Amino acid sequence: MVYDLERTKGVLWLENFVMLALTGGEGPEDSLASFLTSFIRQGQLRIVSEMSLEQLEVMRRLVPGFVEHFQIISVSEMDTPTSLRIFEYFNQYTNRTININFSQKALELSYVLLDRFVRYESFPGKAIRFLQTCANQAFLANRRHLDVPDVIGYFSQQTGIPDFLLRDDLLIDNESLHRFFLARIKGQNHVIDKICSIIKVFKAGLNDPNKPVATLLFAGPTGVGKTATAKAISEYFFGIGQKYQPLIRLDMSEFQHPGQIYRMIGSQGKLVQHVREKPFSVILLDEIEKAHPLIFDALLTVLDEGMLIDDLGRLADFRNTIIIMTSNLGGTQRSSLGFKSYQGHDFEADIRAFFKPEFYNRIDVFLIFNPLDEITIRAITLKELNEVENRDGIKQRGLKLF
């Protein structure tokens, strides 16, 4: 390949530059990057690539001196006026090629939505990709003109965020909001009230844009509805048009040793991979107190800055996630299933004593789940039985469970 490129005076384009340091021998010193160094130095091979500043530092660390053989050109993100002009050029292109036209307000709204929610990519590339997707779907649906509702609809499909949380002209119906959670969460009305407040803050755009949407800690024994609440939040916030529930659950008892941290936040870690694939989702860290303290230290960056960079310099953006941690601290000894009263016990004091202040202080909302009384237990049982009764295998046989 090197000799063919030299003979034809061709240029090799590499999309993933860091892989040069990871491909080849057992270590970076035996990698493809090291092998190609002499060809680059002698002018036999010309390479063009792209990378983030973080990836550039990774390459300098893995293969010292390699990137110094390249001319490094810094490319800044386009400003708003320039990006909007690019949108207009793209609109002219789609109008000319497939007869699809975006209104000016639709183009401007695309910029606003992408600027607020898709900060892990840059303009104009992220906008062109989004507008291209909108145009393709409109073409298949035999639509020729796209306006504000269309752009919101397509963005909602991609992110799972309901349109009324994206549109300034639509208000949240407080009654239907509470009804949604009351149908899914039993016996925890104070929790529902707090969740509704978080949703209203998000709707108003008042949440900190440089942190996760919210960081919550649910305390209480097993069986009081902590996981069910996390599922309900993910369904409401990010569940529109999604095939799979936008939630990842990590059992933190699986991360009790220092070396296991990379299984969570390393380049192949479960959490990092999930957030890259589904940046709009709920992250449920179950029984957080069972994780190794190094996990808490690593999570500080996520809770404080809303971002995490893995060992290969790749960014995982948590600013569109809701992080929910559950804890049984103080509740296990008193009630194994949450059916007995623990009234008067200071769960928050247990949590505060367990975590370092810098970790505890980054939790936005601390919620203690009530024990379940007989009426609530009956309501939950009937709800679960009703869901089972509505399954095809039961309905087709005409069976009744109660």
Language-model region placement:
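AAA+ P-loop NTPase nucleotide-binding core of proteostasis motors
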Residues: 1-402
